[in-house]
Design a protein with these regions (language model features):
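Alpha/beta catalytic barrel-like cores
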Residues: 1-86, 94-96, 146-149, 153-161, ...
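Alpha-helical scaffolding segments of alpha/beta enzyme cores, especially the outer helices
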Residues: 75, 79, 104-118, 141-150, ...
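Glycine-rich, often proline-containing surface loops adjacent to acidic residues and nearby aromatics
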Residues: 84-92, 121-128
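Surface-exposed cleft-lining segments at the edges of enzyme active sites
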Residues: 60-65, 88-103, 130-136
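Residue-level preference for long, well-ordered alpha-helices that form the structural scaffold
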Residues: 69, 98-105, 136-143, 228
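Aromatic-anchored, glycine/proline-accented short structural segments
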Residues: 117-168
Length: 228
């Protein structure tokens, strides 16, 4: 929390470049300069907060790792709403172009997303495709087709976001914005270093960075405020 607090209170952490921050539950329940984290970020920085709600990944099956069950989800969502959080984030991972596996990933993500929308929050649906997947492009093709099937019948009032691995074919996900419910599409760095991630991201219109690892990798507690 101290590390995150130092990031949040830094002069260079502003809404000129940052629109949202993903929090762990512990960070959401902690305070920054006397205010709960989400309130601090909104009141002082005009940056919205997202709560990480998944409980990690299940064992790999059908070329994918689904999320473990989230038994306390409704309680956590209620807490998040009380703490003025804007949305949530939940991650699952695709390793192979297995239609059954990818279908299951998308079904699970959208099922949780509905519960989250019903609670009044905006879910970030994150079906990561492993950057080392031998048939990454094929995985992305199946993933997008499955997502479109869901979006066709999705209530346009239930706003959602997507967090994707930067696609092999630039702008692969761009037309998901044709659906009114899609607020933002963000990219994960997925193990690329910052230079590579930025270079690939630049080829994708309307896709914004959600690169915690790439952005935080050079920080450490012993740096002066300026270096930090």
């Amino acid at each position: 929390h101290e590390m995150r607090k130092r990031v949040f209170t830094s002069k260079s952490f502003t809404n000129e470049h940052i629109i949202g921050a993903i929090l762990f539950e512990k960070t959401m329940l902690s305070k920054v300069n006397g205010e709960f984290t989400a309130d601090y970020l909104w009141n002082e920085k005009k940056i919205v907060s997202f709560l990480k709600v998944d409980k990690g990944l299940a064992e790999q099956n059908n070329g994918v790792k689904l999320m473990k069950p989230i038994p306390e989800l409704e309680t956590e969502l209620k807490e998040a709403v009380e703490k003025h959080v804007f949305g949530t984030k939940m991650r699952s991972v695709i390793y192979e172009p297995n239609v059954e596996g990818i279908k299951a990933i998308v079904a699970q993500q959208f099922e949780f997303a509905k519960t989250i929308c019903d609670a009044g929050l905006v879910p970030i649906i994150e079906p990561e495709v492993d950057i080392n997947a031998p048939e990454k492009e094929k995985c992305e093709e199946i993933l997008k087709a499955e997502i479109i099937e869901k979006l066709k019948t999705w209530n346009k009032e239930d706003k959602i976001m997507f967090k994707f691995t930067i696609p092999t074919i630039a702008n692969h996900y761009l037309d998901l914005y044709d659906y009114e419910c899609v607020v933002r599409i963000v990219a994960l760095s997925g193990g690329y270093d910052i230079d590579k991630a930025v270079e690939l991201l630049a080829k994708n219109n309307r896709m914004i960075a959600s690169f915690s690892r790439a952005l935080l990798q050079d920080l450490n507690a012993n740096q002066s405020q300026e270096e930090f």
